[in-house]
């Protein structure tokens, strides 16, 4: 479908209330899933970030790299495993994750954004003490299970990110971080995005996924919800697929930490960030605090 000039003007005018509401606000976006592997979607995501920045909104990108890490592990002949939705991280796996996240995935996204101008700067959780990690376990069949060098975020130092925002840059964050003793951990990008959104007092947290949003009775396609409150979401958590658990935990953490809304959106939709932020229909599920 080709839009007329009037149609294009109407689209821009319709976005005005959302643009006004988000002006000078921080939006943390967790970049992952198919949006990271499809060239068309990667280009659209980069354009979305530049659009937000040039509309007076402050995007902060936190990226994963699961498919790329898995591909590199396979190429190197290193076994990989997941438990409770989290990657089991041995020292060998950590070395690969560190290399892939900052040197490949983050660098590619920075370059895509910077095709529009000198906007993006890549940093890791190790830089300027951005994240301080603490070792974590996950629940598997009701049992706390060790998953190696996987951390949670114990502290966030937002100084470096705020300096980049003040300079008009788009921070692109890789989620490798040390603990207080200097031991380095792989932090799930969903977890890191939520902690950073809370620490930055972000207006929104957006989580890109490979599904249309949140299903309350998966795989029943009719159970897709456009909005849910945090109490109802917490009740659903034990019933969710393992891969969705870190994302929903992240949404709840952000909401409990004062972020007004968290959004689980379909990263397979071109320009999904703009669709979610600036249209009534959206591109996923919005999570809000219970009243």
From Swiss-Prot:
Substrate binds at residues 65-66, 87, 186. Pfam families: AA_kinase (PF00696). It comes from the Bacteria. The keyword Nucleotidyltransferase does not apply. Gene3D superfamilies: Acetylglutamate kinase-like (3.40.1160.10). Keywords: Amino-acid biosynthesis, Arginine biosynthesis, ATP-binding, Cytoplasm, Kinase, Nucleotide-binding, Transferase. One of its GO terms (biological process) is L-arginine biosynthetic process. One of its GO terms (cellular component) is cytoplasm. Its EC number is 2.7.2.8. It catalyses: N-acetyl-L-glutamate + ATP = N-acetyl-L-glutamyl 5-phosphate + ADP. Its main location: cytoplasm. Signal peptide: none annotated. Catalyzes the ATP-dependent phosphorylation of N-acetyl-L-glutamate. Belongs to the acetylglutamate kinase family. ArgB subfamily. This is Acetylglutamate kinase. The lineage of its organism: Bacteria, Bacillati, Actinomycetota, Actinomycetes, Mycobacteriales.
């Amino acid at each position: 479908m080709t839009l007329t000039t009037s149609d294009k003007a109407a689209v821009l005018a319709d976005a005005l209330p959302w643009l006004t509401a988000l002006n000078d606000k921080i939006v943390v976006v967790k970049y992952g899933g198919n949006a990271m592997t499809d060239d068309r979607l990667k280009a659209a995501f980069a354009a979305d970030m530049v659009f937000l920045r040039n509309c007076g909104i402050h995007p902060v990108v936190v990226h994963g790299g699961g498919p790329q890490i898995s591909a590199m592990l396979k190429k190197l002949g290193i076994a990989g495993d997941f438990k409770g939705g989290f990657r089991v991280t041995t020292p060998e796996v950590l070395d690969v994750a560190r290399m892939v996240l900052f040197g490949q995935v983050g660098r590619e996204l920075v370059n895509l954004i910077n095709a529009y101008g000198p906007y993006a700067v890549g940093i890791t959780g190790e830089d300027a003490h951005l994240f301080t990690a603490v070792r974590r376990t996950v629940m598997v069949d009701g049992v706390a299970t060790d998953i190696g060098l996987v951390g949670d975020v114990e502290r966030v130092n937002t100084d470096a990110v705020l300096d980049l925002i003040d300079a008009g840059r788009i921070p692109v964050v890789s989620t490798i971080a040390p603990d207080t003793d200097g031991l380095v951990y792989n932090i799930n990008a969903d977890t890191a995005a939520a902690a950073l959104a809370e620490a930055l007092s972000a207006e929104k947290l957006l989580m890109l996924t490979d599904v249309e949003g949140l299903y309350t009775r998966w795989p029943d396609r009719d159970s897709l919800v456009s909005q849910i409150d945090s109490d109802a979401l917490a009740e659903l958590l034990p019933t969710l697929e393992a891969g969705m658990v870190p994302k929903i935990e992240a949404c709840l953490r952000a909401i409990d930490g004062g972020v007004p809304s968290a959004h689980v959106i379909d990263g397979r939709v071109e320009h999904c960030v703009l669709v979610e932020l600036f249209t009534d229909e959206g591109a996923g599920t919005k999570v809000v605090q219970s009243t």
